[in-house]
Amino acid sequence: MINDLISDSLTRIRNAGMRRLETTQLLHSKVIEALLGIFQAKGYIESFNVIEENKKKFINVVLKYDEKGKSVINEVKRVSKPGRRVYKGKDEIKRFKNGYGTIVVSTSKGVLANDEAYKAGVGGEVLCTIW
């Protein structure tokens, strides 16, 4: 049984990128789907789609690589964990890696990237960072 679905999903994406796999399969949840929507909008993955097999939902993720075949994801890291929650205010999530990275935040307005959360004027639980 998986206790932390977000950590498991990020690890699967990281491992698939290191092995240069074209796709990887994740367990489905609404938070993971929102997280992947941000990754796709920011250009870290090509696409994703939800599939249902035997009444279970999965997400197929198509990874993105540069012209040299290297994954465009340099590092993806889980920040807030089940044993230690990390919360940041709107002023603390303004920029990450001088604008080259993204902080994904779970807010009262949904799961948002750091620039969207700053514009909306909300803070929240920091789910992960990616660059």
UniProtKB/Swiss-Prot annotation:
Q: Which SUPFAM superfamilies match?
A: Ribosomal protein S8
Q: What does the record give under GO molecular function?
A: rRNA binding; structural constituent of ribosome
- Which terms does the UniProt entry file under GO BP? translation
Q: Which UniProt keywords apply?
A: Ribonucleoprotein, Ribosomal protein, RNA-binding, rRNA-binding
Gene3D superfamilies found in the cross-reference section:
3.30.1370.30, 3.30.1490.10
Q: Name one Pfam family in it.
A: Ribosomal_S8
> Looking at the UniProt record for this protein, which Gene Ontology cellular component terms does it annotate, in alphabetical order?
ribonucleoprotein complex; ribosome
User: What is the role of the protein in this entry?
Assistant: One of the primary rRNA binding proteins, it binds directly to 16S rRNA central domain where it helps coordinate assembly of the platform of the 30S subunit.
Which HAMAP family has this protein been placed in?
Ribosomal_uS8_B (MF_01302_B)
Give the family this protein belongs to, as stated in its UniProt record: Belongs to the universal ribosomal protein uS8 family.
Assembly and partners are described as: Part of the 30S ribosomal subunit. Contacts proteins S5 and S12.
Q: What is this protein called?
A: Small ribosomal subunit protein uS8
Query: Which organism does this sequence originate in?
Result: Campylobacter lari (strain RM2100 / D67 / ATCC BAA-1060)
| Gene designation | rpsH
